[in-house]
Regions:
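A SAM-dependent methyltransferase catalytic signature shared across enzymes that methylate proteins
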Residues: 128-143, 164-168
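A short, glycine/Asx- and small/polar-enriched loop/turn
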Residues: 63, 152-157
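Short, solvent-exposed loop/turn segments at secondary-structure junctions
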Residues: 73-75, 114-115, 147-149, 165-167, ...
Length: 406
């Protein structure tokens, strides 16, 4: 058995998706921190007693380790909910960076939602990068789609990987997902991302009530109107495809804009899609903490179960979640998919095994690559952030490094 040589601290660990992936890759997680009690219970049951309950906005003694990993809470700028720029949790990104700069581990991994890039006009990006570059870290910061790493869902996230005085690599894609940028090229050499059906087909029939044969694999009975909506929706369709009499009142109010005389005009894009039936042969839409009941099973007339959501996040069936159903969905939806974490960890482990301490260069912090988009189009808000990063960290014109596709 290979000895676990490299140690890890997992800050803001949640249910432990990052820790699980890093453990499977061969790292040893020696300390994990969170403040949400269901997360602490879930982590302790599945991954070990090295988890601690603590508010990381307050002082704490952290153990020295090879790497620090983590995803500071994103609720203040998540697109899954209302953005709140004054949410105190936003400042935890800077706290995370300062922990790394002070402890000076050999490497770090950071994960967050795509809204992180444009939050506060790019201030959160600077809050992350400034202390780390000053401390000597050489950093890749890229937006990725977890589907390109074999996770059966289109999940766009921001990943940063850094090495202290040495140059880490960024993990290569392992799969190609239909509709993902570069899919027409990658499909020639990479296997397709698993579909929803491939990910879920070995689960037994969902029970009609808890506890179920597998934890979380049950579905409540639908109301009459919910059943009618489910029966009417075909794979790929959403609430806006329903006849008006089946649409939810709140959807109708927001889906129609009114002109001066009060007459409703045509439906607009940007209205909430409400429930949606997933396509069986595609990866899922992103699983989020607040989506319970939103996604309908591709064929069955019911929402996805909690366990099906966990599977789409690549948690094993024997991974037990604590708390009520809302807590469990929050833990699952906020987690880093363990499979994505494992790919990142394996790549970092290979880098560390190749790293020669003599290659260390003092005070050589820099941004090695910055890839803030997966498409050719750039919004004004994102263009502002790109310009901000270029002016702050790059001394020569290297736009191709900023818009890297690989």
């Amino acid at each position: 058995m290979k000895t676990k040589r490299h140690t890890v601290l997992d800050l803001f660990c949640g249910a432990g998706g990052l820790s699980l992936g890093f453990e499977k890759a061969g790292f040893q997680v020696i300390q994990a921190i969170d403040r949400f009690e269901p997360a602490i219970q879930t982590y302790r049951y599945n991954l070990g007693t090295h988890v601690e309950s603590h508010d990381l906005s307050q002082p704490i003694k952290l153990q020295p380790a090879t790497a620090i990993i983590g995803g500071p809470p994103c609720q203040g700028f998540s697109s899954a909910g209302l953005r709140q720029s004054k949410d105190y949790r936003n400042t935890l990104v800077g706290k995370f960076a300062r922990f790394i700069a002070d402890l000076r581990p050999c490497a770090f991994v950071f994960e967050n939602v795509e809204g992180f890039l444009t939050a506060e006009n790019g201030e959160r990006v600077i809050e992350l990068l400034d202390p780390l570059v000053e401390a000597g870290y050489r950093i890749h910061l890229r937006k990725i789609n977890a589907a390109n790493f074999g996770v059966p869902q289109h999940r766009k996230r921001v990943i940063a990987v850094g090495g202290l005085g040495w140059e880490p690599s960024f993990p290569e894609y392992t799969h190609t997902a239909y509709g993902a940028p570069g899919a027409h090229l990658a499909s020639q050499i990479l296997p397709p991302t698993p579909s929803i059906l491939k990910a879920l087909h070995t689960l037994p029939q969902a029970d009609s009530r808890p506890p179920g044969a597998i934890q979380g694999h049950f579905s409540r009975q639908l109301s009459e109107i919910e059943l009618q909506r489910s029966l009417a929706l075909k794979p790929g369709q959403t609430m806006r495809d329903l006849p008006e009499e089946l649409q939810h009142d709140s959807f109708r109010r927001r889906a129609f804009r009114r002109v001066r005389d009060g007459t409703p005009s045509e439906k607009r894009g940007g209205a909430p899609s409400g429930i949606k039936r997933l396509k069986p042969d595609d990866p899922s839409k992103a699983i989020t903490g607040g989506m319970q009941g939103e996604f309908l099973h591709p064929y069955e007339h019911r929402p996805l179960t909690i366990r099906e959501c966990a599977r789409l996040q690549t948690f094993p069936d024997d991974f037990i979640f604590f708390g009520n159903s809302t807590d469990q969905m929050q833990l699952i939806g906020n987690a880093v998919p363990p499979l994505l974490a494992e790919h990142i960890a394996k790549n970092l482990l290979e880098d560390l095994d190749r790293f020669d301490g003599n290659d260390y260069e003092e005070n050589t912090g820099e941004i090695l690559s910055f890839v803030p988009t997966l498409s050719s189009g750039v919004s004004p808000a994102l263009r502002h952030v790109i310009d901000l990063v270029k002016q702050r960290y790059f001394r020569q014109p290297i736009i191709e490094r900023l818009m890297l596709w690989d």
